[in-house]
């Protein structure tokens, strides 16, 4: 590394006047490891820290902003500054934070007030994280200052929970003992956020509130608080006793809310559900210290007040999720059976099989609100199941089949129909069904082929295929177009406004602009579900073909949109090729055309199956010349010697060519194989001249065929039949053949005709 570098003092002097890119350059320079030098500590680095402290203590907000950024960069990349001046910088930053918190209303009203609080809180959090797990720094610089930092952060959490709660959560988890004196104050702030402002908070902030409330139960309970009976003092106190107390307190608050639903639905019609509700855990109100939520105020004359039921259940579900999902420094006891029973009860609160109370059936507005809130009540059970399955996995394996059976209750059906899905309601529950598919995918990954429930899977496939289409917002407008046109003709043209006509023209001329498209996260969940279904079941023809159409059409659309096919669709196409279903409908050609540029190994193997090269051998099998023939091995390695006679020179030449062709024969090629002789009489054997004469005299009427004798090195003889074209000779009349048989026998020299010679030359 070069020893030439910018002096720290030069950078420190320019900090006060630096702006924009110059300030960014200074921060980038301070990150260099050149400045990690003990020789610079007393002079150069101390001067830099002095300038940083001056910026932090300045009354100018921009200088404060620069001082916070510089202190964070210096402490993060220079261990010498962190070890020697980290506590001093932390104290200066949190003192300014405390000062700004006291004047929160005036500071936040400025244009940069939100950003100023953000940099102050993040700087404190970063320096605290840098000091943690360092024994000396933590003991001497961090812990003493936390006692002053925590109250300021708790006060500010009332106004900026999204910024402050993550910092307090880390401090509460790591420094539980230091946080203990401020537990009641922090609990009061959290309860106020839960009771008054919870519905107005964002999803992320709501989760932070519930997690901080759960982490307050890390503090151990005093012995005097557990029991006043001295006889129970010898019992073992578990490390999670306070945590379990809070968990059971939240779990027990579900039962009163569910019992309120008994005023809407007739639970007595389902004895099993009624027994489950009675079995839910309950804690006496006198011993329940966690009971802080106000009672619900419901009025059937004001139907919208019924929305408080799903809102309260959602709050309790968020708090219960925090208790069962957060990491803790000790093992905890989670009542999985009680949570599963609670979820079954929540899924059972449905008008699918339970009737409404008689006195509520006539009010249409009330019935509309009830039909809207019941799926939201069921959805809280699905959320709890999702967290339980994701966090505890196979620990709840015994509950999985029951969970799938209960999920069927969440699928809406049309009234007075034979299991016909109400897709209008399904379209309004798209977000909820995304959670359902995540839950089902996790369950099926554990069950796999052991599952025999196909009815729920078939219904979920229909729901997934319906929700996979982009939602058009103006479908209902086109359906009612005729009635709208009639109403428009009745109205006077003078009352029509040009602005309204222009707005409606966009709807009718560009309907594709009023479409809600699905996200890739949604497609990924659905594709995982389809892959699991195809792997584990043989689906009926209709849903299977619908899945094929979905995968092909969506792949084409996404390829045109993004320029490539997403990975989840590639996996789905691969699964469809490997599992064609009962109809044996293969989409291999279509899949190959879609994925021709991906170079997928599986599709290439299916199109061009190949045997591994190391397993291919050229085998030379022995020739079978009949029952009397002997096996000849290694014909290609031996030389054949022929005995030619003067009377059949031409025949010997042709025979020699045949032998040469025989030597070049390779067994794997069918065209060179020697045909097997089936007729034993057609086998030619060696015989002497005397045998020929005797045979001539006894059977002179038979036609004699020429054979050629050949000898092999090992003494064995191989008789090769001369292949002569006899097609024309066979076509001769029988009379000529009889005359030839009556003639005296002699061995003539075979003279080939011109036609036959031409054919042999061509061969």
UniProtKB/Swiss-Prot annotation:
It is found in: Nucleus. One of its GO terms (cellular component) is nucleus. The keyword Chloroplast does not apply. Residues 718-763 are annotated as: Disordered. One of its GO terms (biological process) is rRNA processing. Disulfide bonds: none annotated. It comes from the Eukaryota. Pfam families: RIX1. The modification N-acetylserine is found at residue 2. Keywords: Acetylation, Nucleus, Ribosome biogenesis, rRNA processing. InterPro entries: RIX1_N (IPR012583). Belongs to the RIX1/PELP1 family. Component of the RIX1 complex, composed of IPI1, RIX1/IPI2 and IPI3 in a 1:2:2 stoichiometry. The complex interacts (via RIX1) with MDN1 (via its hexameric AAA ATPase ring) and the pre-60S ribosome particles. Interacts with NUG1. PANTHER family: PROLINE-, GLUTAMIC ACID- AND LEUCINE-RICH PROTEIN 1. Component of the RIX1 complex required for processing of ITS2 sequences from 35S pre-rRNA and the nucleoplasmic transit of the pre-60S ribosomal subunits. Regulates pre-60S association of the critical remodeling factor MDN1. This is Pre-rRNA-processing protein RIX1. It comes from Saccharomyces cerevisiae (strain YJM789) (Baker's yeast). The lineage of its organism: Eukaryota, Fungi, Dikarya, Ascomycota, Saccharomycotina. The gene is RIX1.
